[in-house]
Curated annotation (Swiss-Prot):
Its EC number is 3.1.3.16, 3.1.3.48. It comes from Pan troglodytes. The gene is DUSP29. This is Dual specificity phosphatase 29. It is an enzyme of class 3 (hydrolase). Substrate binds at H146, C147, V148, M149, G150, R151, S152, R153. One of its GO terms (biological process) is negative regulation of MAPK cascade. Homodimer. Interacts with PRKAA2.
Amino acid sequence: MTSGEVKTSLKNAYSSAKRLSLKMEEEGEEEDYCTPGAFELERLFWKGSPQYTHVNEVWPKLYIGDEATALDRYRLQKAGFTHVLNAAHGRWNVDTGPDYYRDMDIQYHGVEADDLPTFDLSVFFYPAAAFIDRALRDDHSKILVHCVMGRSRSATLVLAYLMIHKDMTLVDAIQQVAKNRCVLPNRGFLKQLRELDKQLVQQRRQAQRQDGEEEDGREL
């Protein structure tokens, strides 16, 4: 073997070792993650921003707001909102709907949910997240996710979106939202978000293992 071939061989070995080290480091961080308990999660919310106005941007072009914001058609139009997700849809909550915005260029999605710990909001996680994701794919879109106060139901659905479509852990999602708006889902919703977090973390770990096995197979 010539000196040039030796150098090339050593370089390839170094590159492979470096890739393996980085992969192990990333997998180690993921493997170390454990979904926190409800009290620990609530502490993350308490450490967040005290800011609580009618509406706040919590992710680029994604806003959490209250009933007053959703009912103010002039303000919505002036602010350039193109989508509204009502997490308190229904006659006894925020009774808007598609007809309320019929003469405006706004797409509407309603979730009929009660802000009760016993209410199963998790059945709406994926449909609501898909609506938000479709809206944000358009660079010209702005979406308002609201309930009555803009603290529990709407925040829960936004957190689920960030976890499902932005590959965030529940901790990451809470930190992202809480630094921009004072929110606090009820204990029941937190429990449902914890279950979603566990499912998504497990899926990501399985995907990483499969990718690692495929990469190892290509290198052999």
